[in-house]
Amino acid sequence: MAASRPLSRFWEWGKNIVCVGRNYADHVREMRSAVLSEPVLFLKPSTAYAPEGSPILMPAYTRNLHHELELGVVMGRRCRAVPEAAAMDYVGGYALCLDMTARDVQDECKKKGLPWTLAKSFTASCPVSAFVPKEKIPDPHKLKLWLKVNGELRQEGETSSMIFSIPYIISYVSKIITLEEGDIILTGTPKGVGPVKENDEIEAGIHGLVSMRFKVEKPEY
């Protein structure tokens, strides 16, 4: 039963990883994209999860793997078509996440008008931190996120810069996809995305709350 599954281990049993693109204006500009009137959504499979202690696996078909730092919102209970005013009642907690992206593959997908599945949804493309209970974050729009590669600061941003707020995103997504307990929504990345290669070490954190470390590896197959 769902009640026997700890939300703190959401990556072991959560079904849906819903990702929001283009939710920070500075990142939209660096990608030479346009700010849209509605969120851009895409999905990752549950096999994309990589909890801390496991590696980030670099697909053999990319030569340009990028990090994208994101706040993840973990759903605490099922919701469908929830109004924006009630959306936060369904949040169980948060996690820091990476949306690892095969940028060269994504660029080709964009040119051909194809979905981003090959670029975004590969195994271990969603590294996650330890779970942060909702009670420890009174306002998720007042967080500072940071990411370093081999000790060099690459990304730094504040969740107050989101284009679409978390309640809006939850409401919007829930009108399309029924969200279940343990599902997670990645809320977009600030500017500073960039490449990583085999043996690079990524460290990232939410200032004052949680941090995580990962190493980039190539799969054995």
From Swiss-Prot:
Regulation of its function: Oxaloacetate decarboxylation is competitively inhibited by oxalate.
Molecular function via GO: acetylpyruvate hydrolase activity; acylpyruvate hydrolase activity; fumarylpyruvate hydrolase activity; metal ion binding; oxaloacetate decarboxylase activity; oxaloacetate tautomerase activity
Modified sites of kind N6-acetyllysine: K110
Stretch forming the transit peptide: 1-24
Catalysed reaction equations from the record: oxaloacetate = enol-oxaloacetate; oxaloacetate + H(+) = pyruvate + CO2; a 3-acylpyruvate + H2O = a carboxylate + pyruvate + H(+); acetylpyruvate + H2O = acetate + pyruvate + H(+)
CC cofactor note: Requires a divalent metal cation for activity.
GO CC field: cytosol; mitochondrion
Modified-residue entries (Phosphoserine), positions: S37
Cofactor: Mg(2+); Mn(2+)
Protein keywords: Acetylation, Cytoplasm, Hydrolase, Isomerase, Lyase, Magnesium, Manganese, Metal-binding, Mitochondrion, Phosphoprotein, Transit peptide
Residues the record lists as binding Mg(2+): E68, E70, D99
NCBIfam families: PRK10691.1
General function of this protein: Tautomerase that converts enol-oxaloacetate, a strong inhibitor of succinate dehydrogenase, to the physiological keto form of oxaloacetate. It is thereby required to maximize aerobic respiration efficiency by preventing succinate dehydrogenase inhibition. Also acts as a weak oxaloacetate decarboxylase (ODx), catalyzing the decarboxylation of oxaloacetate (OAA) to pyruvate and CO(2), and as such is likely a regulatory enzyme in the TCA cycle. Also displays acylpyruvase activity, being able to hydrolyze acetylpyruvate and fumarylpyruvate in vitro.
Family: Belongs to the FAH family.
Protein name: Oxaloacetate tautomerase FAHD1, mitochondrial
Source organism of the structure: Pongo abelii
